[in-house]
Amino acid sequence: MLSLTLQTTASDTILFIGGGAVAERRLALCLQEPCQCIVISPVITEQMKSWYEDDRFVWHNTIFTDEYIDMVKRCKLLFICTDNTAVNDYVEAISRKYGVWLNRADDATSCDFTVPSTIDIGDLHIAISANNGGPRINRLVKRDMMNRYSELQIAIPRLKIMREEVKLLIPSVEERSQFWRTYLGESEFQAILKGQWPLIEEKLHHAISGIRTKS
């Protein structure tokens, strides 16, 4: 499996065929990105209705027909989320004809891409996929990682500032790498996870001050 990060723009369209629970989960992720989301479905979930009433996506309250083929051709990504196999087969055939990347909820083998479960812990963004092992595994791993890495929410913003300081003080890429290997190794990382970030932060500040004094 090749994992990629898609960068969308305001001019990109992401199209959803279907309006059930799967479409809702996929749409929830896309609504956080700078793109236009369009849903074609005669029925949508209550949560999707709430988003629609807030003008967060475009809803075509109808079944998929040939009228929407041009929309498929123009979209950046296509999510096929209906419970009708014949409709899903037809929409997939159209997307294949025009080279549109698709994700099909009822057939993982037909997917050009998958949507991993994601975790945001401050500046840390983690994608999780059990490779079709089931959503339960994803949820358990997600919960474990949220607990395990919660301390990084405090540490990462400060480390970003320190990284810029070290860049200014140490021009050499190799020497900078050596600095971080020396002062932010596995033992320091484990200490951060155990809630000892203030101690590690103090040590890093001391090391940076030492470099500043020498220069």
For every predicted segment, state its role.
Residues 20-22, 85-86, 132:
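Residue-level detector of alpha-helix initiation sites
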Residues 53-70:
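Glycine-rich, highly charged phosphate/nucleotide-binding loops
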Residues 132-215:
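An accessory alpha-helical subdomain
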